[in-house]
């Protein structure tokens, strides 16, 4: 099944000159969404993660779907100030400025094997920061998975070289 037709191109969003790749049509279609979960499930079968980590916000949708599909636990990585209790945090560079991500300090008990998921891999900044955060929290990062990858932005190159990185749809 070709998943490209489940992605809608939205020009000039969120600002002029940006072509946004929207997975909303995929989320609305039970057949397309099931195909995504099945394909990511095959990756889970090979990597054998203990937990799925999803990056705010659409990574929550992908991550919870996959965690439920494979009967695994889910850990959210959030923007600052959104998680109660003790957290680990990491600051990372954006095109203009910096941002911060946080994870519960007790989320990685027992050094679990972690698969990080998100809807999109672009420059790799957020995914790379999440990979570092997982390691800081004590997790063993085994892979990253994305629905869409914008290959021309070379985000894959910013991710650790010792993990498996998979994307279901590639745009160049």
Swiss-Prot record:
InterPro entries: Ade_phspho_trans, PRibTrfase_dom, PRTase-like, UPRTase/APRTase. PROSITE patterns: PUR_PYR_PR_TRANSFER. GO terms for molecular function: adenine binding; adenine phosphoribosyltransferase activity; AMP binding. GO terms for cellular component: cytoplasm. GO terms for biological process: adenine salvage; AMP salvage; purine ribonucleoside salvage. Gene3D superfamilies: 3.40.50.2020. It is found in: Cytoplasm. Pathway: Purine metabolism; AMP biosynthesis via salvage pathway; AMP from adenine: step 1/1. The keyword Cytoplasm applies. It catalyses: AMP + diphosphate = 5-phospho-alpha-D-ribose 1-diphosphate + adenine. It comes from the Bacteria. Disulfide bonds: none annotated. Its EC number is 2.4.2.7. The keyword Nucleus does not apply. Signal peptide: none annotated. Its main location: cytoplasm. Keywords: Cytoplasm, Glycosyltransferase, Purine salvage, Transferase. Homodimer. Catalyzes a salvage reaction resulting in the formation of AMP, that is energically less costly than de novo synthesis. PANTHER family: ADENINE PHOSPHORIBOSYLTRANSFERASE (PTHR32315:SF3). Belongs to the purine/pyrimidine phosphoribosyltransferase family. This is Adenine phosphoribosyltransferase. The gene is apt.
